[in-house]
Amino acid sequence: MQGLLFSTLLLAGLAQFCCRVQGTGPLDTTPEGRPGEVSDAPQRKQFCHWPCKCPQQKPRCPPGVSLVRDGCGCCKICAKQPGEICNEADLCDPHKGLYCDYSVDRPRYETGVCAYLVAVGCEFNQVHYHNGQVFQPNPLFSCLCVSGAIGCTPLFIPKLAGSHCSGAKGGKKSDQSNCSLEPLLQQLSTSYKTMPAYRNLPLIWKKKCLVQATKWTPCSRTCGMGISNRVTNENSNCEMRKEKRLCYIQPCDSNILKTIKIPKGKTCQPTFQLSKAEKFVFSGCSSTQSYKPTFCGICLDKRCCIPNKSKMITIQFDCPNEGSFKWKMLWITSCVCQRNCREPGDIFSELKIL
């Protein structure tokens, strides 16, 4: 009887072993004895590997691209820019408000695309507008703010011939509200051609590419660190892209401006410098070197001083969290004082009504 029982248990054990080897055996059980569940979650690729293995030389990032530590906490990398592929190791540029959007890679959420964290608003004539907000800066235009950019369309289509404002016909009076704007609208039809977007671009042949570039826009701030931009195709792919640079016209400290000495018999001091060199600060990071830049000065009358001659330099910034990045910057060599003062970012500054 005992031999029969032993044989039965042995055969049952062998059968269970064979079934498991063939993959047809019973499901694994949990520690509590319940049948385990097979997970349907896809396996994600592991981008981080420890211990860390980093190249001996740090990567050289293009100007404007941050040098940061990767998401694994190991090596220095060039941060990914808007539209580039990112993952848990290849981080997006933190100094530009970017994050890795994994929404397209469902359900793995393994790789994403760098995108801006929040759609920023717009600033025009010292007034802040929210993203998507429609506003009317003057009677001629209606504008829309979209992620820091402003687009405007004319509210009127001028009629250059057959004007109903030339005189009343049949004893009827014309609408004086529209007639008062008609001289402005007539000039609007041609004056737009003087704006920067319609000017001929400077042309340069370089490496089989016809290089084109618009003029740099005025600095976004009259004091402190600002940004100016232009559109150019001076790149490896010869594609039209927006290029940005830092600009620093004047310090914002009013006490510094009070110390500027205007020569006797003069009403303006076009340029001035601080007594000692200082480091630039941008996005919470400071320049690796100290600089003594030339600033545009002040006038006793209503004139303002703007850069006249300048060159471009590259500034290296280091951050508290061991990251770093480079930016191109406007380096002023001389300034000129004029009565035609414009607010920074005024997109209508060159639209002249004659």
Curated annotation (Swiss-Prot):
Superkingdom, natural source: Eukaryota
CTCK domain boundaries: 268-342
UniProt protein name: Cellular communication network factor 6
Signal peptide from the UniProt entry: 1-23
SMART domains, alphabetized: CT, IB, TSP1
Tissue localization of expression: Predominant expression in adult kidney and testis and fetal kidney. Weaker expression found in placenta, ovary, prostate and small intestine. Also expressed in skeletally-derived cells such as synoviocytes and articular cartilage chondrocytes.
Gene of this entry: CCN6
Record-annotated disulphide pairs: 48-72, 52-74, 54-75, 61-78, 86-100, 92-114, 268-305, 285-319, 296-335, 299-337, 304-341
InterPro entries on file: CCN, Cys_knot_C, Glyco_hormone_CN, Growth_fac_rcpt_cys_sf, IGFBP-like, IGFBP_CNN, Insulin_GF-bd_Cys-rich_CS, TSP1_CCN
Gene Ontology molecular function: growth factor activity; heparin binding; integrin binding
Record carries keyword Coiled coil: no
Membrane-spanning intervals of the chain: none
Chief place where the protein resides: secreted
